[in-house]
A protein has these predicted regions:
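Non-catalytic interface/targeting segments
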Residues: 1-93, 99-267, 271-312
Length: 312
C-alpha cells in the first residue's frame, strides 16, 4: 500500500465519522473550492490545495519516499527518537497522531469544526463562531514560533515515510463515544464514568492512573443533555463557551483534557465536565483507524502512548 492510499483511507474514515455529518463536511469543501477559484494567481500559488479535498488541516503526508508501506510504527507523539526507533525496528512508515510540519503550523484552522458541532447541540452558530474566533487566533499565534519541521527533517534524512492523522482519528473516537454513551443512557455523572471504564482503552488507562475523571460536578450530579464537544476539533476551545452551552440547555461535557481556566468557567456555568483522558481517547480513535490498516495487510507496531486494542 502506498502512503497516498493510507492518507485517503484516513480522510474517508474521518468524513464518515464526523459529528457534523457528511453533508456539512461536503458543504465546507465546496465553500473552500469557491474561495480558491476567486483567488488571484499569486494567492493560488500559496494556497494549500490539499484543502480542496481534505477538510482536516491537521492531517497531511509529511514525507513520501514513494516506496510502498508494509511495516508501520504508530504513535501519539512522534519525534526524532521515534523516527530512529522506526529505523531500528526496520519500519518503512511512521504514523503520528499529533500533527507535525505544516499540519501543526495550520492546526488552528481545523478548530472551526468546533463551532459547527456546538451549533448541532443548540448553541447559535454566530455565537459559537464569535466566541471561538479569539481562541483560534490565540492558538495560531502560540503555534507560530514552534520548530514545526524538526521531525519531518529527521524522516527525510532517514528516508522513512511520515504521515500525521489527527482529526480523522479524533472523529472516530467522538463518533464511537457518542453512540456508546447514547446507548448507555446515563442519568448521573458517576454512571458516565462507570460506562467509560468499560471501554478497554479507558479500563487500561485506569491502571496507569490516567483513567476517566470528574473535573466539574460529582458522581451524584444529574447529567442533563450530554455534549461531546471536546473530543475532536484540533485542541481546547474557548473558555467562554460554557456559559453559552448552559444557555443552550446542555448539562454535561465529555472531553479529553481541560485547562484550569476552562474548568473554572465550566464550574461557574454549572456545566458538569467528565474528562475521559487524553492518551486513552487518542488511543481509541487511533485503534479504530489502525484496525482498518491491519485488515488491509499492513504490519503494525505501536509506541508513544498508544494503548493498543484490536476490535476487528
Amino acid at each position: 500500500m502506498i502512503l497516498q492510499q493510507i492518507y485517503n483511507i484516513a480522510i474517508e474514515m474521518g468524513v464518515e465519522s464526523d459529528l457534523r455529518g457528511k453533508a456539512t463536511v461536503q458543504k465546507v469543501l465546496k465553500q473552500t473550492k469557491e474561495k480558491y477559484q476567486k483567488l488571484d494567481k499569486n494567492k493560488k500559488q500559496e494556497f494549500d490545495i490539499e484543502k480542496l479535498t481534505n477538510p482536516y488541516s491537521d492531517t497531511r503526508i509529511l514525507f513520501d519516499n514513494k516506496k510502498p508501506a508494509k511495516k508501520i510504527l504508530a504513535g501519539v507523539d512522534i519525534g526524532t527518537g521515534e523516527m530512529l526507533l522506526a529505523k531500528r525496528l526496520r519500519c518503512d512508515t511512521v504514523v503520528s497522531h499529533h500533527p507535525l510540519g505544516l499540519a501543526l503550523a495550520d492546526l488552528s484552522d481545523v478548530m472551526h469544526l468546533q463551532a459547527q458541532v456546538l451549533a448541532q447541540y443548540g448553541v447559535p452558530i454566530n455565537i459559537a463562531e464569535g466566541v471561538l474566533k479569539e481562541r483560534i487566533e490565540e492558538v495560531s499565534r502560540g503555534i507560530a514560533p514552534i520548530n514545526h519541521n524538526r521531525t519531518v527533517d529527521s524522516a527525510k534524512l532517514l528516508n522513512i515515510n511520515l504521515i500525521c492523522i489527527h482529526t480523522p482519528c479524533d472523529n472516530l473516537a467522538a463518533d464511537f463515544l457518542d453512540e456508546y454513551i447514547k446507548a448507555k443512557k446515563p442519568e448521573t455523572v458517576g454512571q458516565i464514568i462507570k460506562a467509560l471504564k468499560e471501554i478497554p482503552e479507558y479500563n487500561q488507562a485506569v491502571k496507569l492512573k490516567a483513567g476517566p475523571r470528574i473535573f466539574v460536578g460529582s458522581e451524584e450530579s444529574s447529567v442533563g443533555r450530554i455534549a461531546l464537544t471536546e473530543i475532536t476539533g484540533g485542541t481546547e476551545g474557548a473558555k467562554e463557551i460554557y456559559e453559552k452551552m448552559a444557555q443552550a440547555g446542555l448539562g454535561t461535557v465529555i472531553g479529553m483534557h481541560l485547562g484550569e481556566e476552562h474548568r473554572k468557567s465550566a464550574q461557574e456555568a454549572h456545566i458538569n465536565v467528565v474528562i475521559a483522558g487524553h492518551m486513552s481517547s487518542d488511543s481509541l480513535g487511533i485503534n479504530l483507524f489502525l484496525d482498518e490498516l491491519e485488515n488491509r495487510g499492513l504490519e503494525l507496531i505501536t509506541c508513544s502512548g498508544i494503548i493498543r486494542v484490536k476490535r476487528k
